[in-house]
Design a protein with these regions (language model features):
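Alpha-helical assembly-interface signal, strongest on the long, hydrophobic N-terminal helix that forms
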Residues: 1-84
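Short, conserved structural patches
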Residues: 2-3, 58-178
Length: 178
């Protein structure tokens, strides 16, 4: 014959039972820990892409500073993309702008124009390398995908209509007189 426990005794026995305690703890703490882990990976990847873009643009600008006549917009993008190896489809996602500056107030103050992946258009920008001994200001923008779009820090990143994150780099140099 099966003995029935009084409900209060059954509850006391159930409350003292330790089986499954770690599963409940993991269900509470696990998502927070995983979100922190993926956010750290996301920010590391974004920083890597941003630093590679910045470095590639600076290296290309240094080359252009000495030999500006040999560079077109396509050559500039191609050279940047050869240095920025972590950017996928670099030539498709990169937009470059280059303009001579006469005085300090001529530096563009508007937002850097980026590729619109949703409309599949590249904005019109000028690419004028400048003459000898002229200050040249340039901007580059690459639109990259986030790794974890619906998780952690990626939720707070400023993304465009296609879900891409805009990475920008700015540079200035004086064209060498040849």
């Amino acid at each position: 014959m099966k003995s029935r426990l009084h409900p209060s005794l059954w509850f006391k026995r159930y409350a003292r039972d330790q089986e499954g305690a770690t599963a409940i703890e993991f269900a509470i703490v696990g998502p927070l820990f995983l979100s922190l882990l993926f956010s750290s990976i996301e920010m590391g990847w974004v920083m890597t892409q941003s630093m590679m873009l910045e470095s590639a643009v600076n290296r290309t600008a240094r080359s252009m500073q000495i030999n500006s006549a040999a560079f077109s917009a396509v050559d500039f993008k191609r050279t940047v993309c050869s240095h920025a190896i972590v950017l996928k489809n670099c030539e498709e996602i990169l937009n470059v702008e280059l303009s001579p500056v006469d005085v300090r107030g001529d530096i563009p103050t508007d937002a850097t124009r980026c590729v619109d992946r949703a409309a599949k258009t590249v904005p019109l920008t000028q690419f004028k390398p400048g003459n000898g001994n002229q200050i040249v200001f340039g901007r580059a923008c690459a639109v990259v995908d986030v790794l974890t779009p619906g998780l952690g820090v990626a939720l707070s990143l400023p993304v465009d209509s296609s879900g891409g994150l805009r990475l920008t780099a700015r540079f200035a140099f004086v064209s060498e007189a040849i």
